[in-house]
């Protein structure tokens, strides 16, 4: 005779068909919570002997084990409870929490989903599922579950905050800002949310409000180095040098191991580190427990500090080490750049010019000016000059074109046709998307500059969207450009080619050849300006620049250093100074130490 499959037993199918006494269970939990853990566990084990088929007791037992950091035992207890009652949502949830602590993210996700499938209106399960999805970088999926968490619990401040972080991770600044605002509305003393609200304001160029929220965060919790560091960066963008230095010093004071504070202080040429600061930097550098991010930052900081002191050997040693570590961290290969440039050629080589004449006849309410070239070529300086004109607003670096290009080449734009991704219909959508990226700007100006250097890759896209666009291309001695790039520790994953001299030479070659391609494809439409000519003949070159942009003469453009706008680039300090010459010669001091770079760039020197 076949044995019948046993029916799962729920919490009512136990001793004498009764549930364990709830009052007794709560009493045991209270005992455990008071710190009398051993007594509570003894009482619970005795109760389990009386009610061996009660999943509720196994759930409590698993929770006790988890609290005692007996994670593997807790997993066993939760799984036993689920064998008795597979539809016990809370146990699936607790199992997910424990698996997450064990680092078993995929298994944790499965458990959270099981809990939600049984009990959809379960805000904590949606919240923790969102957190797990963030770990594996599935941000859009995470956002859906954070949104459900706040639907089912509208007062869930932490869920709003993490929803903001997820939106921030995909550069959805508008939504992230709203989420942080909601978290703060529920919990006004939420220091982390105030800090990240400041970050969002900074991301969109509203530096004054960024400072306000950093200060609010510090008023709530004055012991967070990261927030002082953020405040210092924002103050630097507004040329509040003394305030900026103090904020970075405060960051290092709160946490002497906060490497980024020393790196940012090293960016001020007039700043001299004291003995305690030097000792702290060297301690970080020698530490066995320092993480890669901080080790890279401290190498660049020590390099700058020694450069300012004239210690050439130490400067170069720390600089080379910082670059070596950064290249290793990014796992960059020049082959990836070869592929991306090849994709550009394939996309635009056969495209007629102009390929969509109808767009030329559409009047724009906002007129874009693009300032581009290699990083460290002078794009910030030129934007500072042009944005000093009364009719122009300098938007800084707006990276929307890179995103748009990625979308059209991956065929994910709406309404696209298989072989016509740059159809008029799609180009209108792209144009709208470009202007949407400026929606946050508080400006009455109709002429807006975008000085993202990397936009040199997307000149074909720019002229497709804006056939009458003004494009200013910065040219500079390639030795000055590449040496300056090599000395910089760029944030995020931008400019990944920067940390190796051979990579720099090869990338410069790719850039140079692509610019030749664009000039041939769009003859007479790209305005080349030489950085050295601009610094030598400021007024003459400025007049030519404004003439190309179809702007009347404005004396303010000669006094660009008086422009009070926020400058969110590594050149924020330089553009506050009057025009100076000689910066393109800085590499000569180290020529014998960077010979591979110098030799590799010889084919691209002006003759």
Label for each model-derived stretch:
Residues 29, 59-66, 90-101, 124-135, ...:
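Conserved alpha-helical positions within TPR/SEL1-like repeat arrays
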Residues 266, 278-289, 299-368, 415-446, ...:
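PAPS-dependent sulfotransferases, especially Golgi type II membrane carbohydrate sulfotransferases
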Residues 361-464, 474:
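Phosphate-binding active sites in nucleotide-utilizing proteins
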Residues 50, 84, 118, 152, ...:
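Structural marker of alpha-solenoid helical repeat scaffolds
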């Amino acid at each position: 005779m076949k044995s019948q499959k046993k029916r799962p037993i729920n919490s009512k199918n136990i001793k004498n068909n009764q549930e364990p006494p709830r009052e007794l269970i709560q009493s045991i939990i209270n005992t455990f919570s008071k710190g009398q853990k051993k007594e509570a566990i003894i009482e619970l084990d005795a109760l389990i002997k009386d009610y061996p088929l009660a999943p509720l007791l196994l759930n409590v037992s698993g929770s006790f084990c988890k609290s005692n950091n007996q994670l593997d035992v807790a997993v066993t207890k939760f799984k036993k409870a689920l064998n008795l009652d597979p539809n016990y949502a809370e146990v699936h949830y607790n199992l997910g929490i424990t698996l997450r602590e064990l680092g078993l993210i995929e298994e944790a996700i499965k458990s959270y989903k099981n809990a939600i499938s049984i009990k959809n209106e379960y805000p904590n399960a949606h919240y923790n599922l969102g957190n797990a999805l963030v770990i594996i970088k599935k941000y859009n999926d995470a956002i859906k579950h954070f949104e459900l968490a706040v639907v089912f619990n509208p007062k869930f401040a932490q869920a709003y905050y993490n929803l903001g972080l997820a939106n921030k991770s995909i550069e959805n600044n508008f939504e992230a800002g709203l989420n942080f605002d909601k978290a703060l509305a529920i919990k006004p003393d939420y220091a982390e949310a105030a800090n990240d609200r400041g970050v969002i304001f900074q991301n969109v160029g509203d530096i004054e409000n960024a400072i306000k929220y950093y200060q609010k965060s510090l008023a709530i919790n004055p012991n967070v180095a990261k927030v002082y560091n953020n405040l210092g960066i924002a103050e630097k963008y507004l040329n509040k040098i003394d305030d900026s230095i103090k904020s970075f010093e405060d960051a290092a004071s709160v946490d002497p191991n906060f490497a980024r504070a020393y790196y940012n202080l090293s960016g001020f040429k007039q700043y001299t580190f004291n003995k305690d600061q030097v000792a702290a930097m060297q301690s970080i550098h020698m530490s066995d427990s320092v993480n890669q991010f901080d080790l890279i930052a401290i190498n660049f900081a020590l390099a700058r500090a020694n450069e300012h002191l004239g210690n050439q050997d130490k400067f170069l040693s720390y600089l080379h080490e910082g670059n070596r570590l950064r290249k290793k961290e990014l796992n960059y290969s020049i082959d990836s750049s070869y592929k991306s440039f090849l994709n550009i050629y394939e996309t635009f080589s056969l495209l007629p010019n102009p390929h969509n004449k109808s767009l030329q006849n559409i009047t724009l309410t906002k007129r874009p000016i693009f300032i581009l070239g290699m990083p460290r070529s002078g794009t910030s300086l030129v934007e500072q000059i042009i944005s000093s004109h009364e009719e122009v607003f300098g938007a800084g670096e707006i990276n929307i074109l890179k995103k748009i290009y990625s979308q059209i080449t991956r065929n994910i734009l709406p309404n696209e046709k298989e072989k016509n991704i740059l159809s008029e219909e799609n180009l209108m959508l792209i144009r709208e998307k470009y202007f949407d990226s400026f929606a946050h700007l508080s400006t009455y100006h109709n002429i807006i500059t975008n000085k993202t250097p990397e936009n040199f890759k997307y000149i074909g896209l720019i002229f497709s969207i804006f056939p009458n666009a003004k494009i200013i291309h910065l040219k500079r001695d390639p030795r000055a450009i590449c040496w300056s790039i090599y000395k910089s520790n760029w944030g995020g994953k931008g400019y990944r080619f920067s940390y190796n001299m051979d990579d720099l030479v090869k990338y410069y070659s790719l850039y140079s050849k692509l610019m030749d391609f664009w000039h041939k494809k769009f003859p007479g439409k790209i305005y080349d300006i030489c950085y050295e000519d601009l610094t030598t003949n400021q007024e003459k070159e400025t007049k030519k620049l404004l003439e190309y942009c179809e702007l009347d003469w404005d004396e303010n453009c000669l006094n660009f250093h008086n422009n009070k706008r926020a400058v969110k680039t590594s050149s924020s300090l330089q553009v506050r100074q009057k025009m100076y010459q000689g910066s393109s010669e800085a590499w000569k001091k180290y020529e014998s130490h960077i010979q591979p770079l110098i030799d590799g760039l010889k084919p691209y020197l002006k003759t």
